[in-house]
């Protein structure tokens, strides 16, 4: 069974990029997360302790983005994926990071999928 816990449009103003202006001026960074979990234990116990705490995860992702002052979106997205997979409930994660103001006429970003399950 694979259920999905998702966080969409998590928006943080942060330093991200290699251009001189990107190193000085924070820009919006938008993150979407989809974490594969098995929600049966939480459904049966009705205990919050048996769930993935998405509020806590959102705070951790925001802190990572702001404190990291990343040069490359590739480094950031892999660090976010590793953070998500450190949650014991998560068996896989899709992460999308967008820089909506990087180009005047388009939204750019990167999407990755990582899994703890090896087939």
Predicted regions and their residues:
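Extended beta-sheet lipid-handling architectures
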Residues: 5-7, 80, 95
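Residue-level recognition of well-ordered beta-strand positions that form the cores
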Residues: 11, 32-36, 96-98, 111-113
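Short, well-ordered secondary-structure micro-motifs
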Residues: 18, 44-46, 105-108
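Conserved small/polar residues in nucleotide/adenosyl-binding loops
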Residues: 117-119
């Amino acid at each position: 069974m694979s259920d999905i816990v998702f966080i969409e449009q998590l928006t943080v103003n942060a330093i991200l990029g290699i251009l001189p202006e990107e190193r000085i001026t924070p820009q919006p960074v938008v993150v979407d997360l989809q974490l594969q979990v098995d929600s049966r234990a939480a459904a049966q116990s009705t205990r919050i302790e048996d769930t993935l705490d998405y509020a806590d995860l959102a705070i951790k992702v925001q802190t990572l983005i702001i404190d990291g002052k990343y040069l490359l979106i590739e480094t950031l997205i892999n660090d976010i994926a590793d953070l998500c997979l450190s949650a014991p409930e998560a068996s896989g994660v899709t992460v999308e990071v967008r820089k909506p103001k990087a180009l005047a006429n388009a939204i750019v970003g990167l999407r990755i999928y990582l899994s703890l399950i090896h087939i």
